[in-house]
Swiss-Prot record:
Gene Ontology molecular-function annotations: magnesium ion binding; phosphoenolpyruvate carboxylase activity
SUPFAM superfamilies tied to this protein: Phosphoenolpyruvate/pyruvate domain
Gene name of the encoded protein: ppc
Family: Belongs to the PEPCase type 1 family.
Provenance organism: Mycolicibacterium smegmatis (strain ATCC 700084 / mc(2)155) (Mycobacterium smegmatis)
Protein name: Phosphoenolpyruvate carboxylase
Coiled coil: none
């Protein structure tokens, strides 16, 4: 699929003059050519010359379109009426190419970093090495460092996503191809077992071609749970303990008296199986399965490592000394064998106790169990104490190098993963809480009509309920199906906390939180399940209540809601029971859908400023949880820049951030790439916490005023299109594949929270995914161009433009907003979007909406150039520029085929091949864009 002299990577589109360093990128281009050629050979061998010729013709014509040599309609005509049997392999070919291009890009990142290091250049920004240099230069006060990093936590939270539809087999095969390309990177022509690398590539690409890329049945939550868990074996078990140890050691070396990071700073989380907001498929059984499978994966890893250590630590008592603690541990092993091998005997004891633990807490037993009749570990701390005894003995007797190896990694892993693996958040919509709590209060005779009460009355009633130990419901109470289900889910969470430890379910998130009573309703449900008790002298609150502010209005009121809750003695007691920590989640997705890109970003920034001030006034330790999606329209973009763009005081050593779908695969599917991405999260967190990165000083308030005005203008322009244009919902539903996202078994969750046609009720993921597939990318830019143009106005002396140019140069937040927007604009394609608009049968509606979109798109690019001084959208992002050049012509056929198949599907041609083709195009585009939803 790629000629040896392929000139198709020449510049195109709105970013065509970007200099991407042709010499620097040539090795990647060679990798892409190699993989593309092997794929082309595979297509020809497996599907014949006719299919190969169609694929190759589509590829060549796509490049000709990009060079403006032919009109796009000629490519569209090629696929008009194409037989579905032929369309499927064409779609698969371009989808596979996108997947292989991802491999080549990932390998090239490693190559560029290696070149950078070999050249002796300073560490790259976003690396921990660069961050340590900045911290050293800042000459920080040790007390400030210690206070800031108290309770530090950086937590990537894995969430389910409808575009991550790849099967485990595909995931594993891609991993093997990556390993082979990595060997080539280091100059090898043969594998470790003497196999020819190119032959192996052909074998694995053939396997990939013959493997179904996607599931044809609707994803079950159990499938999504397994998808999330696979990243632990793939990368997290190796990388997270390693990075935690590296950061802890580096910081303690700089500030040895500060006792920094006594708990691991990097701890993963998950929503999969606990997020029931709008997902009726989450049940008590699902929560139990999610927490149980997570614990299984953790303990299976420990068994594997303990078994390996038993083989490795074979030292004889005749040759080495041991500590009394190790000797006592070994003496608990009564097996007659290995009498002269104290470390092996000690590890057998650990192995046996871990087996007893697994048998008591797991429904499914891992391999490598050992039954010696020894008692279980009651807590991970007990398990760790025995490992520490082995470690201490090794270090005390000249074997530090052994202690630092597998045993050291295992000890770090236990600190992070415990028996729970990752914390599973519970999430539910506030409307559901209100309905259930109203039923419980009525059943218990506390109040017959809770929903009729005013907000102050609700707060008074709920606070009183929280303060008492008495439950509202007795066993066997006759409740509605909804109430039984909700109470059952919280009870399943309580079981997980009891069985796997308090970190198993750390948070209860309230979606669409709009009041103090919304927070207290969740607390009442926690109390019913035994997860909250503030009635005695020792308050118990293992699960934090986390308000999620999602709309722009709620973001603006979030700090006042939080302060009002903290004014209540009952709620303050709950927070104090959690060492004064209060988490607040910020919704990037719904705020963007509500008010548009610029207004949402500014509302989030303002909300953070206000919440930081509220935390200062009330004396709590605030942790912000950023509900970011993969796309810019859902808060995505480079993590390092995004974290540094946070307002002063908003990070303070801690943040959590959602990771979703194909973005998870892009960041965490490989240990080396995972290490780099996790390192980036930590580097940005440390810099944002300990350094002054905002850079505005006394000019902050004038800058904030400018953004207040710009955000209002942007929201006005966005609302005029999305919320006020007659027929807009119809245009959206017919010009994008949003309806098919729900109909074609993508993801376990419905596309809307409620069965309505309202944009407000539509979930943010399908909203953004649909616009991404149709190449409009509207959520990532619309309204911003109008805001800038209107704010600058006539401005005869250019003063206002200079204000914006100065903010771009000095303020990380503003620069990041424009940089992320530029990435979206570079991926948008109004020519392809026009093809999708043709799916709208009402010509007047089509013209009315699409003309507005095109005009705003052009306006936004023009304003970006004025403010940044850059003619090219990707002038400051060479890596993305390379990606755009290398892969976007290969997306063109996928878009044209998607439009063709959507037209057929909607006209009644609903056979299985057409449906599968649409699903495959969605998967292919998501794979190629890498952050589509």
């Amino acid at each position: 699929m790629a000629d040896s002299n392929d000139t198709a990577l020449e510049p195109f589109g709105s970013v065509q003059r970007t200099h991407i360093g042709r010499e620097a990128s040539e090795p990647m281009r060679e990798d892409i050519r190699l993989l593309g050629a092997i794929l082309g050979d595979t297509v020809r061998e497996q599907n014949g010359e006719e299919v190969f010729d169609l694929v190759e013709r589509a590829r060549v014509e796509s490049f000709r379109v990009r060079r403006s040599e032919i009109d796009r309609s000629e490519l569209a005509d090629m696929f008009s009426g194409v037989d579905a049997h032929q369309a499927i392999p064409v779609i698969r070919a371009f989808t596979h190419f996108a997947l292989l291009a991802n491999v080549a890009e990932d390998i090239h990142r490693e190559r560029r970093r290696a070149v950078h290091v070999a050249a002796g250049k300073p560490p790259q920004d976003s690396s921990l090495a660069a961050t340590y240099r900045k911290l050293d230069a800042a000459d920080l006060d040790v007390d400030k460092v210690a206070d800031t990093l108290t309770g530090a936590l950086v937590s990537p939270v894995i969430t389910a996503h409808p575009t991550e539809t790849r099967r485990r087999t595909v995931f594993d095969t891609q991993h093997r191809i990556t390993e082979l390309m990595r060997l080539r990177l280091h100059g090898h022509t043969r594998t470790d077992d003497n196999r020819d690398i190119e032959t192996e590539l052909r074998r694995h690409i053939l396997t990939l071609w013959q493997t179904a890329l996607i599931r044809l049945s609707r994803l079950k939550i159990s499938d999504e749970i397994e998808t999330g868990l696979r990243y632990y074996e793939a990368a997290f078990f190796d990388v997270i303990p390693q990075v935690n140890a590296e950061v802890r050691d580096a910081l303690r070396k700089r500030w040895p008296d500060a006792k920094l990071l006594e708990e691991p700073i990097l701890r993963p989380g998950s929503w999969i199986g606990g997020d029931r907001d709008g997902n009726p498929n989450v049940t008590p059984e699902v929560v139990r399965h999610a927490t149980g499978r997570a614990a299984y994966v953790a303990l299976a890893h420990y068994f594997e490592q303990i078994t390996a250590l038993e083989q490795e630590l074979s030292m004889s008592a005749r040759l080495v000394k041991v500590t009394p603690a190790l000797a006592a541990l070994a003496d608990a092993c009564h097996e007659p064998a290995r009498a002269d091998e104290p470390y092996r005997r000690a590890l057998r004891v650990i192995h046996a106790r871990l087996t007893s633990t697994a048998r008591e807490i797991l429904d499914e037993q891992p391999e490598h169990g050992l039954d010696l009749g020894l008692p279980r570990y009651q807590t991970p701390a007990e398990f760790l104490a025995d490992l520490d005894a082995v470690d201490g003995s090794l270090r005390a007797n000249g074997s530090r190098v052994l202690a630092d190896d597998r045993l050291g990694r295992l000890r770090e892993a236990v600190r992070v993963f415990g028996f729970h693996l990752s914390g599973l958040d519970m999430r539910q919509n506030s409307d559901v809480h209100e309905e259930v709590v109203a039923e419980l209060l009525a059943w218990a005779g506390v109040h017959p009509d809770y929903t009729s009460l005013s907000e102050p009355q609700r707060v008074e009633l709920l606070a009183a309920e929280i303060a008492t130990r008495r439950p509202l419901i007795r066993e066997g109470a006759e409740l509605s199906e909804l109430a039984q289900k909700e109470l059952g889910i919280v009870a399943a969470a309580a079981r997980a906390v009891k069985v796997f430890g308090p970190q198993a379910v750390p948070n209860y998130i309230i979606s669409m939180c709009q009041s103090v009573s919304d927070m207290l309703e969740a607390a009442v449900l926690l109390k019913e399940a035994g997860l909250l008790d503030i009635s005695g002298s020792t308050p118990y609150a293992p699960v934090g209540v986390v308000p999620l502010f999602e709309t722009i209005d709620d973001l603006q009121r979030g700090s006042s809601i939080l302060e009002a809750a903290l004014d209540l003695p009952e709620y303050r007691t709950m927070v104090d029971a959690r060492d004064g920590h209060q988490e607040v989640m910020l919704g990037y997705s719904d705020s963007n859908k509500d008010g548009g890109y610029l207004a949402a970003n500014w509302a989030l920034y303002r909300a953070e400023l206000d919440l930081v001030e509220s935390a200062r006034k009330t004396g709590i330790r605030l942790r912000l949880f950023h509900g970011r999606g993969g796309t810019v329209g859902r808060g995505g973009g480079p993590s390092y820049d995004a974290i540094l763009a946070q307002p002063p005081g908003a990070v303070k050593g801690s943040l959590r951030i959602t990771e979703q779908g194909e973005v998870i695969a892009a960041k965490y599917a490989e240990p080396r790439i995972a290490h780099r991405n996790l390192e980036t999260l930590l580097a940005a967190t440390l810099e944002a916490s300990l350094l002054d990165v905002e850079g505005l000083g006394e000019e902050a308030e004038p800058a904030y005023q400018v953004l207040d005005e710009l955000a209002a203008l942007a929201q006005r322009a966005y609302s005029e299109l999305v919320h006020e244009t007659p027929g807009f919902v119809e245009y959206f539903k017919t010009s994008t594949p949003v309806s098919e996202i729900g109909a074609l078994n993508i993801g376990s969750r419905p596309t809307s929270r409620k069965p309505t046609t309202s944009i407000a009720d539509l979930r943010a993921i399908p909203w953004v995914l649909a616009w991404s597939q149709s190449r409009v990318m509207l959520p990532g830019w619309y309204g911003t161009g109008s805001a800038f143009e209107n704010w600058i106005g006539t401005d005869p002396d250019g003063a206002r433009l200079r204000v914006l140019q100065d903010l771009y140069a000095r303020w990380p937040f503003f620069r990041t907003v424009l940089s992320n927007m530029a990435q979206v604009l570079a991926k948008a394609d109004m020519g392809l979007a026009a093809r999708y608009s043709e799916l709208v049968e009402d010509a007047d509606l089509r013209a009315r909406v699409f003309d507005k979109i095109v005009a705003e798109h052009d306006r936004t690019i023009r304003m970006h150039r004025l403010i940044t001084g850059q003619d090219d959208l990707l002038a400051d992002n060479a890596a993305l520029a390379r990606s755009v050049f290398n892969r976007f012509p290969y997306l063109e056929p996928l878009n044209h085929l998607q439009v063709e198949l959507l037209r057929r599907y909607r006209s009644g041609e609903t056979d299985e091949l057409v449906q599968r083709g649409i699903l495959l195009t969605m998967s292919g585009l998501a794979t190629a864009l890498r952050n589509s939803g």
